[in-house]
Structures are given as structure tokens and as C-alpha cells.
């Protein structure tokens, strides 16, 4: 059964640094697929991680937890069927609610051979106040649902 781990956090919080560290230490020897969700035409870290031998499925047209829930489920199913990974890491855009990403995974996990394993939020403590003020509920939700 494929384990699914969600690594969330706002832009610049250190998600990619955390993921790279986990890939080289905690997940060494596992077949890992990274699903990253970035706004814009090109995912920010795709090229770097591909060079590390990590399969990446980039979804650039919206937030996993918002407009792509249907496409997200299809993408997740395709990844499991095509790669049969030990683990899938999901790095959602930092502009959504972690609770919605968790729900999106739980909604499809029974249809595929996968299980939600963990959900983590990376936070830059030097920016907590400004993020809390500017992003309110979205920022609070990511911290509240990290587990």
C-alpha cells in the first residue's frame, strides 16, 4: 500500500528543503513520487528534484484543494497505477487550507491502494505574525490541521 504524506506551508517556509532532507534520510531507498502544486506555468522546483531521480507530477492550473479536486483524484490514481510507489509526497500550494487537501486525499484513498500517512506544515516563525494578519484563516488552518 502506498503511503501519502502532505507537506504544506506558505511560499518560502522551507517545504522543499524539508522534502529534500526527508528524501535523502527518512525515505532513502523508497520509490517516491512528488505531486507538487504551484501557480503559474512552471513548477518552481520540478527540474531540481527530477535531477535527483524523483518522479514529479506537476499541477499548475490551481490549488489541489479548490478547483482541481476532481483532477487531483484522477492524477493520484494515475500515479499509483503507473509508478506503484512506496510513498507519494504532496506539496500543495500554500494558498489553500490544509484541511481541504486532507479531505481531497481521504475522498480518493479508498479507490486506490493508498493510505494517508501524515500531514505536516512547515512554518517560518519569523513570518508568523504577518502571515496570520494577511492570510488569517488559511494560515491558521495549516497550523491547526498539521498532525
Task: Label the model's feature ranges.
Residues 119, 136-147:
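Contiguous mid-protein beta-loop-alpha structural module that forms a pocket-lining wall or clamp
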Residues 2-8, 13, 17-132:
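Nucleotide-state-sensitive switch-loop elements of NTP-binding domains
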